Amino acid sequence: MSSKSRDKHISTLVKVFRNSGYDGASISQISKATGLGKASLYHHFPGGKEEMMKSVLDFLGKRLENHTIQTLRGEGTIPERFAKMGEAFMSIYEGGEEPCILAIVLLGNAQDKFQEQVHHFFRSWLDEMTKVLVEDGMDVTTAQAKSEEIAIGIQGSLILAQGLSNPAIFRRFIQSIPEKVNKGRGTKDEGQR
């Protein structure tokens, strides 16, 4: 399978696992969604459904790294970089319309199988937010708490938006991120805020 073809199938797998969860997605359902026969699925993913989910998490981990964590390392003021990170999450979760597959995979029997990958993403994300805030002059303890607050807000607002069928909840939180980042920042030059 070419890299482009594999990415296309992994994108389809993302949709299947988002909609059905890991435990709920059957090989028949995956076969139908990807257009690959069961034999082809096992040829490309010899480890079966577990390998498919690991591939999905690798794919999403790279996407999240490239589109969220990298924005924190980019150009602009601290609030602007956090705003860009929020915009990336808006895109990934389609404005709050799509659930977080990382949260889905932690439900049911799949948790033990994929905990390491999920832990790695969340740890990398929290560490990068903390690093940026510390470099801006915030003390480590406050920066860690602020990073956790932002991550909890993003994930929590997404779950609430899904549970209430109201994506505006997620959008409002994303829009509030720059203000939340500014709270607790030192008295740096106003031009740098």
Label every model-predicted segment.
Residues 92, 107, 151-169, 181-184:
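Amphipathic C-terminal alpha-helical segment
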Residues 93-113:
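Amphipathic alpha-helical segments used for helix-helix packing
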Residues 8, 12, 16-55:
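Helix-turn-helix
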Residues 141-160, 172, 176:
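Hydrophobic alpha-helical segments that form the core
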Residues 57-63:
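Short, basic, alpha-helical segments at the C-terminal edge of helix-turn-helix-like DNA-binding modules
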Residues 68-97, 140, 147-150:
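Hydrophobic alpha-helical connector segments
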Residues 185-193:
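Short, basic, low-complexity termini and linkers enriched in Ser/Thr/Gly/Pro
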Residues 65, 111-136, 145, 175-182:
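Amphipathic alpha-helical packing segments from all-alpha helical-bundle domains
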